[in-house]
């Protein structure tokens, strides 16, 4: 029996609508290249590498990013007591922070968040979509608003998430579109530090000014890869490893920034 033409037309319309909806879902966000920030201040607030002896050293990573009206906590270290103590030493009250971004679900990056939320519960927290239901429920139970991230998204003026990258450990990094170039902030760089930098360049079509955070013990060849990617300055810390930090320092010289807990970088 021959199918009526109107039924075929209706079916084709349904298929086209479905593709249109799915296409919107998978299309990467359009980024306004003119959406940028001026002065940026990054404070290494939690690290297993010492810089300022007044601050407590503990395994993990966290930094505070000041952007005029916005103050972002990127990762929270392993222990809330250490995090809160270091924030106090830096003269930062928990309630001054209005956005939290967690890079990935490892204890040395998320361990301080629940204690922090006791001091500042009504806050937006951006987490990779892959976070466990348990941790998401724990965070939500404190009163925070959770935003789950899968693809690149805008967080605030001039600040974006790369979206969750990687396979075994899914992780997001921050990209700050500054007037001097891209500032890329990584937690542990499980997806590969060069992959993260390439993703940022792909999103913005702009050169990286500074890459800061944990580089996850990459091979020495990464130093040359950074040069090819036109990375201007580097500030590796946390899980980067002494060998790669020494290699970066030899190659980058004045553009190598020695980082560690208590370090303040102003751009």
Residue ranges and their predicted role:
Residues 73-77, 97-105, 126-129, 184-188, ...:
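Active-site neighborhood of phospho(di)ester-bond hydrolases with catalytic His/Asp-centered motifs
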Residues 81-126, 201-211, 227:
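Active-site metal-binding motif and surrounding structural segment of the metallo-beta-lactamase
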Residues 112, 182, 188-267:
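Cap/insert and terminal regions of metallo-dependent hydrolase folds
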Residues 127-172, 178-179, 257-267:
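Metallo-beta-lactamase
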Residues 42-89, 171-186:
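Conserved beta-strand hairpin/beta-sheet module of binuclear metal-dependent hydrolase folds
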Residues 5-11, 16-68, 151-165:
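Zn-dependent metallo-beta-lactamase
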Residues 40-43, 72, 98-99, 123-124, ...:
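Structural motif
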